[in-house]
Amino acid sequence: MDGRNIPAERWRNMSQEQRREIIRRCLRGDETAYDQLLGLVRAEPGYGMYASTGPNYQFAIFGRDSIEAAEDMIEFRPDLAREVILLCAHLQGHDADELSEEEPGKIHHEYRALTFNDRHIPEASQEIFHRLASGWGGAGDTLCYYGTVDATPLFVRLVGRFVELYGDQILDEIIIDRFGRELSLKSHVTRAVHWIVQHVESSPWKLLEFKRLNDKGLPYQAWKDSETGYLHADGEPAWADGGIASIEVQGYAYDALKAAAQLQLGVDESENQYFSDLATIVQQQTCGQMWMEDEKYFAMGLDHSPEDPEATRQIRTIASNAAALLDSELLLDLDDDAKARFIEPVVSTIMGSRFLTHAGIRLRSLSHADATEQADYHGNRVTWPKETYDIAKGLRRHGYIDEANQLEERVASSALKSAELYEFYLVNLNGDVKYHYRAQYPDEPRIHEFGGAYWPEPGQAWTISALLAISERRRRLRHNTTHAT
């Protein structure tokens, strides 16, 4: 197991104990183990990270996933963060196209190609490529789909954090986009900010919404993008074709607009001030429109009614999205009274028995146990290490250190128990966690006993980044403690 990089195929053929030992070394702060795990999803030079080592996403490069993983590791893998930033700028939308949902300034959702560095992708991945291209468009041997609302503000936020840590020289780098045009990174980031501003200004709620342009596109265009990702409390699907404002996306929009002002991306000081003022409007509208006083929790989002498109409805499902809002500055910048009103109840709910499991946070509260007949991709019988870690970061940001440590420990212990970096874990309504999904472990209970219909992807990029970030934070804490005594 020497070396800095482990091909995904070799990882799959390792024994459980071999994989577990690499994860164990990672948690001890072994940088060789960091590189070995990160090497599972490192794409060809210049392409950042593949989404996973699994059959569905092993040759897919997602904007959101790559940006969030890069942000997790920005303090100790700045080279990767820079690569992701430049790739997103390279693929940034330039024209308006309903089929691919491309818009000027918009950051991509999913990029696929039939070849990388003259190597053809496997046949199974080619089949996925052609199936998606038939509905989303494609240019010959490449496919770039833009059906996501959150990748664009996340991109701006990532650039802002990179500049804060490493200086603004990166803004002067020249990127050649996929059509051969040359622009500075600063120009690309400014175009992304203008996309955010335009969409917030045009929203009746003055929030950042998604609404698909292509009826074959993803109906829900935030990270919970499955068909049951956004359900009302009575089980009715949120109306995807009427515009939806998702709660956590408003945190990204707020951070991006604040970053735009700090980076001075406006043509003058008045425009920079406008970015900051618009962020405040997003903050006020989020707290005013989405808070459910009777539940002492934020709604999952807002949608319209198909019967009355002018009417606003709260998506009153109790979901993890509200806790993910903690990992932004939107709530952090409130006054003390507002913080007490909003933050403490959210923390109490997310750390309570309706959400907390041995593997992390359920994506939907047990209050909605009957919302679906089986364990849906983003429901109450799954926990995603990515979401659990995002919530842990938010808890730490707001001073809930013990709670953050608890969640990080659940992410770490689940990786050790499973000897894998899974996309999610199935957790039944009694709290039993299924840690193994591989056919070579016949002693494990079958997936249907947990109400699931599919296996999680192994080697998920943002599960790996979460584990590495947890390991690195612990390593630095040990180092600082040692040198302080």
Each model region followed by its residue ranges:
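Extended glycan-interaction surfaces of carbohydrate-active proteins
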Residues: 7-61, 87-140, 201-244, 284-383, ...
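Core register positions within helices of long alpha-helical scaffolds
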Residues: 72, 158, 256-259, 263, ...
